[in-house]
Regions:
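Structural preference for solvent-exposed beta-strand-turn elements
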Residues: 1-193
Length: 193
């Protein structure tokens, strides 16, 4: 089974992430940051991964450490669950609309962290969530998962929709990339990812 359990403890947060790439989209998320919970739930549901996230952090200061550490732990769990990446498709992409928003995401499970993220500048709160953390979420996931990720917001105005469509698009791209396609070995001429 392609599963991982990651626990991350710092002076700022305590994070537990359990991930099953071959799940059914079962989700149990509680970070103490409701909008971030909603986004992680989109990631679990639309990827088809089983995802459990439990975070306690210094949200009395703000949500930055909680969001960052949770994103790092998710990225690590994704990397560990993928293991040697034998038989996966490796590449995935998705185009996701959400009302007036259109987002494109593409992923390469390459072992090399790289992020291209294009979104209109959004500086506001969604509930208690600081939208300036958006890019940092993807940076943190990419760094620990060691993947190349491109996310482009092609159209959109509503901040909630812009964020939600990104998480759905990345989820669908990941779903494709982690799929076992029956081809023997690692999908690289190097023989390793």
């Amino acid at each position: 089974m392609r599963k991982a359990r990651v626990e991350r403890k710092t002076k700022e947060s305590h994070v537990l992430v359990e991930l099953n790439l071959d799940g059914s989209g079962a989700i149990d998320v509680d970070t103490g940051v409701p909008f971030f919970d909603h986004m992680l739930s989109q990631l679990g549901k639309h990827s088809g991964f089983d995802l459990t996230v439990k975070t306690s952090g210094d949200i009395d200061v703000d949500s930055h450490h909680t969001v960052e550490d949770t994103s790092l732990a998710f990225g690590q769990a994704l990397r560990e669950a993928l293991g040697e990446k034998v038989g996966i498709r490796r590449f995935g992409d998705a185009m996701v609309p959400l009302d007036e928003v259109l987002v494109q995401a593409a992923v390469d499970l390459s072992g090399r962290p790289y992020l291209v993220h294009r979104q209109p500048e959004i500086v506001e709160l969604i509930g208690t969530f600081d939208t300036t953390l958006g890019r940092h979420i993807w940076e943190s996931i990419v760094a620990e998962a060691r993947i190349a990720l491109h996310v482009r917001v092609l159209e959109g105005r509503n901040a909630h929709h812009v964020f939600e469509a990104q998480f759905k698009a990345v989820a669908r791209a990941l779903r494709d990339a982690v799929t076992l396609d029956g081809v023997a070995g690692v999908p690289s001429t190097k023989g390793v990812l």
